[in-house]
Regions:
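Extracellular beta-strand-rich recognition modules
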Residues: 305-311, 371
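Exoplasmic/lumenal beta-rich domain surfaces
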Residues: 325-371
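Glycine-rich, acidic and aromatic/proline-enriched surface loops and short helix-turn segments
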Residues: 101-110, 152
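Beta-strand-rich interaction surfaces with strong enrichment in secreted/lumenal proteins
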Residues: 280-284, 293-298, 352-358, 369-370
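Juxtacatalytic substrate-recognition/specificity segment
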Residues: 1-99, 109-117, 121-129
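Beta/coil-rich, acidic/histidine-enriched accessory regions frequently appended to metallopeptidases
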Residues: 168-293, 310, 318-325, 332
Length: 371
């Protein structure tokens, strides 16, 4: 009931027309996974054959055995995901994971500070991007701390406004701020939050720029602040989008000029189109489908008909798929086409037929016979 009062309600009675929420303990939750909520279980089995068709938590019986605190921690975290899915199914991971971490804290069951410590020791972590490879631990820490600052600054009632917003990320926060007639913007709150983290790291308590009733783990050896020489010099550095770098310039008394140059915008992708200036980008959003459709009149075509194209993809292997489909009846029915680099393997149950998954390793050419 407490989490519902803060974040909102899950789908209830939901897909199974049952008010109850179910939990399944199994030894096959996945390597290193304590538990999870799968949005697939909110689908009808006729749409998603692997759906359990109920509001369900999958919990690892081996890793959680004899550890009731960890069970409560995992359930509180995953319940926020279940609630968020009911209101804004494709919310970005930074907000969704941050709110789930906050759910742990609010029920007094956040068991580890390793996430926050990892972030504060290197705060140049994006608050708008989520990694597809490498460690996500500091991202969990950053997202939790920002969510905690939001709750402290605007009150717990504001959290539900963000959850209910169909817009994602900072756009959703801005929309929620307008709804409550706040004069803040998400960017302003981000700037305040970066100041709060710095002041906390320096041992300075400053009212609004601080966390309420919470003390994050201090970074070791002041590692969040980088020292620079005050002598006349220039240097190059990089920063993640909505990441933070802190610099210390110990200078003698006098007048100094600091000039900062940077890029006002960045490309969406790190790779260039295979030719020309443009390529079609499929977007990168949770629980979402993006498509491109074009009509061709092949009624007078003679001989072999081939569809040729270049593509480059980076997908979560076995869970996210890219398909090529054809309809010969105006879109009433669709047939998935087999391609040279695709697969019909479906261990996860997410492959709808024949698709690409994993990493392509760069641009490559595909040619499909449509005859």
């Amino acid at each position: 009931p407490f989490e519902r009062s803060v974040f909102g309600s899950e789908l209830s009675p939901g897909i199974d027309h049952d008010l109850r929420i179910h939990a399944l303990f199994t030894k096959k939750a996945g390597a290193g996974i304590l538990g999870y909520f799968s949005s697939r279980d909110e689908d009808h089995p006729q749409v998603s054959p692997h759906s359990n068709a109920m509001e369900l938590f999958i919990l690892d019986s081996t890793m959680l055995a004899g550890n009731p605190d960890q069970i409560t921690n995992t359930l509180s975290h995953e319940f926020q995901h279940m609630i968020h899915y009911a209101h804004d199914a494709n919310e970005g991971s930074n907000i969704d994971e941050g709110f789930s971490g906050l759910a742990e804290y609010l029920i007094h069951n956040r068991l580890s500070e390793a996430y926050e410590r990892s972030f504060l020791e290197n705060p140049d972590i994006s608050l708008t991007l989520w990694p597809v490879s490498g460690s996500s631990i500091p991202y969990y820490g950053a997202s939790f701390l920002f969510s905690k600052y939001l709750a402290d600054r605007l009150g717990q009632d504001f959290l539900n406004k963000v959850v209910e917003q169909p817009r994602n990320g900072f756009e959703g926060i801005d929309a929620a701020l307008k709804e409550v007639k706040s004069t803040f913007t998400a960017d302003q709150l981000f700037a305040e939050w970066t100041a709060a983290n710095l002041l906390y790291g320096l041992g300075i308590s400053n009212g609004e720029f601080s966390y309420r009733d919470y003390e994050p783990p201090l970074p070791k050896n002041g590692s969040m602040i980088k020292s620079l020489s005050c002598k006349n010099q220039s240097f190059d550095s990089t920063a993640m989008q909505y990441g933070t770098d802190y610099y210390n310039l110990p200078c003698d008394a006098g007048t100094y000029e600091i000039e900062i140059t940077g890029q006002p915008t960045i490309p969406i992708l790190s790779m260039n189109p295979i030719q020309g200036q443009y390529a079609w980008w499929s977007n990168s959003v949770n629980n979402s489908d993006t498509w491109m459709q074009h009509n061709f009149d092949l009624s007078n075509a003679k001989g072999s008909i081939r569809f040729e194209f270049d593509l480059n993809y980076d997908l979560e292997e076995a869970y996210d798929f890219l398909y090529l489909s054809l309809s010969a009846d105006g879109g009433k029915t669709w047939q998935m086409l087999k391609t040279a680099h695709g697969t019909d393997l479906n261990e996860s149950g997410f492959n709808l037929g024949w698709g690409w998954t994993g990493k392509s390793g760069g641009w490559f050419h595909e040619s499909v016979n449509l005859s």
